Amino acid sequence: MESQLKFDKSAFICYKKTKITDEYLLGETLGQGAFGTVRKAVHKLTSQERAIKILKKRQQDERKLFLEVNILSKLAHPNIMEIYEFYEDKANFYIVSELCKGGELFDKMTEKGTFKEAEACPIMLQLVSAICYSHGNNIVHRDLKPENIMIDQISDTPMIKLIDWGGARYFSKNKKMSTIKGTPYYIAPEVIREVYDEKCDIWSLGVIFYVLLCGYPPFNGDTDIEIIQNVENGKFYFPEEEWGIISSEAKDLIKKMLTYEPSKRISAKEVLLHPWFSHYEEKVKQDISVARSAFENMKRFKRNKKFEHATIGFIINQLISKEDRADLMKQFLFMDKNKDGVLTKEEIIESYNNVYGSIDPDVVENMIKSIDLDGNGVIDYNEFLNCTMNRDKILSKKNLEYAFKAFDKDGNGSISIDEIMSIFKKTSNNVDKKVFEKMMKDADSNGDGAIEFEEFNNIMQKFFE
């Protein structure tokens, strides 16, 4: 019965009407615009640094803002900015997200001028992987540009993070979009014509790729009108002075990404298969000890324990630092051979065989059924973290107390059946109440119809035995 319950990362994004300063120490201003401010902040419980976007209510299109929060709360990919919480008070909305310390890609491009192909490759690979994943979830970004790409330094690995999903929306394959979104240099011609699909993102990525390699855009002009006219014309060139040293494969990929007709333009999945990447992609070695630990934890992950799964997901999303996830992130990226942002049965088998020799495909099939919390047949980054994170990092008393208080919505010191149901309401609205009654029965050892902290602690310890 519990197999009916499905949930994704959005179940763990907290919406609060309490004072944000109760949980955060607000620090320096990182950026300021017409609609609000971004400030550095420290989460009091974990001491983690985060970024808080503060938006004045009177200047917001609330429908658009809530759509951005909804989209970010659904996306679980190492190269997409992570959102933690959403606050509201009388004057402002607050979006709490991860803090990226390396600055904008735009600043790096301005400072550096041009990138060698070997330097551009990891940037493009991460960008296209993020967009391939978002397109796979029927989400189009619509405003890809270097100013919306952050660099985050985690250990020795610079990571690209796609930000500003305010112009993003859900799309369907049989329905074109018409609202003009984007920035003149990077906008696709079909967006200007107001009939377009998700391939507009591929055009924008093609422009970014072009600029990385030569330092100027393919469609230039002295004014926005001139730039847009040149985009509409769609003609671009590879002047010998800058492009003579650039490989034919790079030029071929740019041509395919900047194909004028969207129906003939390459898809994100096809971009990732282009031979240019194989020339310059850095060959990463698997850390065998991390891999072994991850696979052992995956095999032990218990099926049909959705309340425990939700608790683990909440703790990982809200409380485990990026530094503590870094090794597992590298393992996920190593296993994701086609770079589409999810792990398939075949990718798990291949990685497992590299470590242990061989595994029965049926074992992997059952493993995926246990781990695949949203039931889509593949393992996303969030689901991977849920089943591989070290037990000791999850089960600290501080983490369990924080999760318990978050689930105890009315603050009466226990979790009721209605409070359990509220955890799953975003993604499993029509599940029979008997499923939740069984959950309660399994956890409620004293039979009083509610889960106290001691009972909550016990079921979590038991889950990892």
Residue map of PLM features:
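Amphipathic regulatory helices of Ca2+-sensor modules
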Residues: 312-313, 344-357, 380-391, 416-428, ...
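Conserved catalytic-loop aspartate of Hanks-type protein kinases
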Residues: 201
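Conserved N-lobe beta3->alphaC-helix segment of eukaryotic protein kinase catalytic domains
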Residues: 49, 54-75
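Activation segment signature within eukaryotic-like protein kinase domains
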Residues: 123-124
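A short, aromatic-enriched beta-strand patch in the conserved N-lobe beta-sheet
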Residues: 85-86
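Protein kinase glycine-rich loop
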Residues: 27-34, 38
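Conserved short submotifs of the Hanks-type protein kinase catalytic core
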Residues: 91-104
